[in-house]
């Protein structure tokens, strides 16, 4: 069905999902399954992708330029490229195995949850719209929030931070 715009198939035992012909898909919720791979390269209209609680080892969203919300938490991702997703406002990628996360092109991002990974650094200098940040349980040694003046909620516990300057974050 090429006219399909919303697909919700969460909470099953799916090991594969073929949405390659569903080019009109706006919303895909395939969370809580057993997916090891997910090809959304033909789904260029995709705005919301919820694929958390699977077994994904990789996720390529480079062709999903309309994507505003991505939840790929609780998978086995070692890398995540969101550089082409400039419309992204919400990114949830917690409980993976990410060692780095480049969100410099995601200037519309206001909600970022990247806790419980293996991040050693996190550059938020371009993310001025950020209001919510959860980066706990990583290996961060520093966290520069001087450009994130809109920040209202911050969770950064269980890292290796030695100092934290919140003087510009008056909304906290």
Give residue spans per PLM region.
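Leucine-rich repeat
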Residues: 1-3, 22-25, 41-46, 62-67, ...
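Conserved hydrophobic beta-strand positions in leucine-rich repeat
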Residues: 7-9, 26-30, 47-51, 68-72, ...
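Generic alpha-helical secondary structure signal
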Residues: 5, 56, 96-99, 161
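Low-complexity/repetitive intrinsically disordered segments
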Residues: 1-15, 153-172
């Amino acid at each position: 069905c090429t006219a399909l715009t919303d697909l919700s198939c969460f909470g099953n035992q799916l090991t594969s999902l073929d949405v390659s012909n569903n080019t009109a898909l706006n919303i895909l919720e395939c969370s809580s399954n057993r997916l090891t791979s997910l090809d959304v390269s033909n789904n260029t209209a995709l705005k919301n992708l919820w694929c958390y609680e699977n077994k994904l080892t990789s996720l390529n969203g480079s062709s999903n330029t309309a994507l505003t919300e991505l939840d790929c938490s609780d998978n086995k991702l070692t890398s995540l490229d969101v550089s082409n997703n400039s419309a992204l406002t919400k990114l949830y990628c917690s409980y993976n195995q990410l060692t780095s996360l480049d969100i410099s092109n995601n200037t519309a991002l206001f909600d970022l949850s990247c806790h419980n990974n293996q991040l050693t650094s996190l550059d938020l200098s371009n993310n001025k719209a950020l209001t919510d940040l959860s980066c706990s349980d990583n290996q961060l040694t520093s966290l520069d929030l001087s450009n994130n003046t809109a920040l209202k909620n911050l969770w950064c516990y269980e890292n290796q931070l030695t100092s934290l300057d919140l003087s510009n974050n008056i909304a906290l």
